[in-house]
């Protein structure tokens, strides 16, 4: 702003993470703006700031294009109240233990055949949908346990699961999000083993 140079915003959705949020966060956003998509909040946040020339958005489907056009044509800037609301929402999101993977796949291929992005994507999806078991004593434990284990085996073949990680760290150097990948894989593997043994 000081130098009068305009900005171009890349990855306004953090690789899709801001469009795929936990259920209680999505409900909160929908309650405030029933007509707005989840993604539109991030687009409007990026576009509201002065000095933004362009917001770049990767689109896979026609509905993404339609939603982007609706968000920016015309852009409805966020109010001060909206910005406070989003700041509070961001704080709530930080309390959820998702892994900040954007599925860029720079960590691939793993020399041991581990499907790192899919493992993280599956874990984040379960967190967002409330299918992470906290304790064997919780009411939802059996449902969450079954949901995680069954969907994990469907999403990731056995020979590509987190249990295969030896902690070589080759993947870590390539991650633009600076995720400590071996540690996260070991955390997921421990969680899976605890579910299998009912020792949470």
Give, region by region, the residue ranges found by the protein language model.
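Structured C-terminal cap/extension of enzyme domains
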Residues: 1-200
